[in-house]
Amino acid sequence: MYRQLFPTPEVAAWRRAQDRARAVPRFTPGSIRLLDYELQYSDLLSLCPQWHDIFIDGALEYRADSAAPRILDCGGNVGLASLFFKRRFPSARITAYEADPAIYKMLRANLDANGAGDVESVHAALWTENGRVRFLAEGSDSGTIEVRSNGIDERTVDVPSLRLRDLIANDPNGRINLLKLDIEGAEDAVLADCEPVLDQIDAIVMDLHEFDPLVRQAPRVLELLTRNGFTYAVDEFVPQPWRPPVAPGTAPFPGKALLWSMTVRAWRA
């Protein structure tokens, strides 16, 4: 009751955003002030849970051994994660990657407008090779590389792709202290390709997405982490019943989502 009557500033900001989101059509770009952040967004309804996860639930809280950790923000969206990391570690060396061309512009604008102009940003999808890929830009935080398409009929665009393995191997800092990975279903393929360089990573926080009910990637990803010396914890299971699956499938359990995501945190013990 006390927290309802006297919410933290972060909760009060989230409630205000939620109230506005109810009155705004989906996928309507705009801007909003939350705490001392001036934020552009592509879809306010998807910004709200991001804010709650990061600034209220502490989904990206991380204890670094250095005051200036090296962080890769893979799937930066409009920049909330990078802004959080920059507030937590003002001297952090952060690179944020975002594939959606329209959202990337918002990411860059939000970094520049909120005291994080030294965060490097790159417009690219993280993948298993350098080049170009087709990307389903659905207008919020669920865009995905076309080979991982789950049947959402949205605008498809051609975007540059970068091989994450090469970025890790050639990083001028030598080690990646934290890899934040939110690449909407490409986790298995990308991490498998990165296996030869995983010893250069200290910790990982990722959203692991299951879009194909016939081919689950979680067992392979978790086994890969164990094989490469990581301890992991899994939580924040989120059903995604609104998504059509990559492959058709039915389950004998009515009302249970075939598609879901979960958060995996991995570290070296």
Label for each model-derived stretch:
Residues M1-A269:
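Phosphate/nucleotide-binding beta-alpha loop and adjacent structural elements of enzyme active sites
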